Amino acid sequence: MELTICDLTKEFGSFRAVDRVSFTMTNGVYGLLGVNGAGKTTLMRMLTTLIKPTDGEILWDGQDVFKMDGQYRKLLGYLPQDFGYYPDFSIYDYLMYIASIKGIRPAAAKERVKLLLKQVDLFRARHKKMKNLSGGMKRRAGIAQAMLNDPKILILDEPTAGLDPSERIRFRNLISELSGDRIVLLSTHIVSDIEYIANEILLMKDGCITISGTADEVVSSMPERVWTFSVPKAQIDAYLKAYKVANIKTIPGGAELRVLSTVRPNSAAVEVEATLEDVFLYYFGESAGNDDVAV
């Protein structure tokens, strides 16, 4: 079971949204990490065959997915960043409706919906209307619809967008439970979404995969070192201008800084272990905080 992406490219006029991307996925969780606008959504839309690439190919066990038509789509489960639903449908009715669209027989659909509602902890809320659900409940209903056909490939585009911290943790745990014997590709611009659950992390910037590997491999790829030290309030701006500052913690009379630098920033600086958050700052810089519309 292997999904292979070969030199995948997508252009919109003169703009290249995805630029010669290549990687291979087998069973496990893959985290596609990048700022909004990096090309993650465009890549996922090609992987789900919603749009065709300008160049390159996507192969499932050696077969071109665009030539497999319905066979490939039967293997897919997809949760887009914004998924549609009828607001007056209950959660149960919504899932049964999606099951019918996916060609699942009514008797089998009832059993599958019941199982998934319990798995995503929505069984007791199954009669609630979709329009009355919290953001977290909607995302859990979304993951349930993506899992209706027990897909071999589960693709999740910014699945924790708009969720509070507790719902993010709950969602991550759910993804881990559902990963099992399947490929899970999860895109996000939030490091904590994938830091502890992804078998492999793919950093995407300007339409390209800049680096990939396990979390430890990605962290060790960063050439800069990480330092912490305290400075008086009057010196904070100077360090902000001179270095990549990963974190500022206010303390009496000044601040404790976490700084990325190849050399020791000052004599008081202590080197500490780098994290994936530090790597994200290194590769994406100021754009790491950009929340523009995804591409």
Q: How does the language model describe each region?
A:
Residues V35-G39:
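Walker A (P-loop) phosphate-binding loop of ABC-type ATPase nucleotide-binding domains
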Residues G56-K67, Q71-Y72:
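Conserved ABC transporter NBD signature motif
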Residues M96, S100, A107-A125:
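Conserved ABC ATPase "signature" region
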Residues K129-L133:
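Conserved ABC ATPase signature
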Residues L154-E158:
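Catalytic Walker B motif of ABC-type/P-loop ATPase nucleotide-binding domains
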